[in-house]
A protein has these predicted regions:
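Catalytic core of membrane glycerolipid acyltransferases/transacylases, capturing the structured
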Residues: 1-5
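Non-catalytic C-terminal accessory region of glycerolipid acyltransferases
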Residues: 8-134
Length: 134
């Protein structure tokens, strides 16, 4: 939210929920692209909540396969599989900033492994091969 008071209330509520031992679903990529199969870049938010409240993140990654059923839109209906990986814990001996980055990197590596195992191909982003525009 662009409203500072709303954000303060949200952040306070998030801390309260996590410190109470409850769970919260956070999409660390902060957006969804319909039927996009590759992991999207992970933002810091979910890992910030985890690190500052000394709680783990539970990496979940959804893969999809075409079914045999052609939808009304001319595309095959997708079949989804939810992969739940082991929890990633913040290290109490490290700073919040280090934990945020390490947890984010570990989550990415888990997603990359799931992607490559499921689809049988290396995770490559086509835009990585494009020249940088200065």
């Amino acid at each position: 939210s662009s409203n500072k008071e709303t954000m303060k209330k949200f952040l306070h509520s998030m801390d309260a929920v996590l410190q109470h031992g409850d769970f919260m679903v956070v999409y660390p990529e902060q957006s969804m692209w319909w039927n996009y199969r590759k992991p999207k870049p992970l933002k810091k938010g979910a890992y910030t909540f985890a690190a500052q409240n000394h709680v783990p993140v539970l990496p979940c990654f959804i893969t999809m396969q075409d079914s045999d059923i052609l939808g009304d839109d001319g595309f095959y209906i997708q079949e989804y599989t939810i992969h739940i990986a082991p929890a990633i814990y913040p290290d109490p001996n490290k700073s919040r900033a280090v934990n945020i980055e390490e947890m984010r990197q570990k989550n990415y590596e888990v997603w990359k492994e799931i992607y490559e195992k499921t689809y049988g191909e290396p995770l490559v982003y086509e835009c990585d091969d494009m020249p940088t525009i200065a």
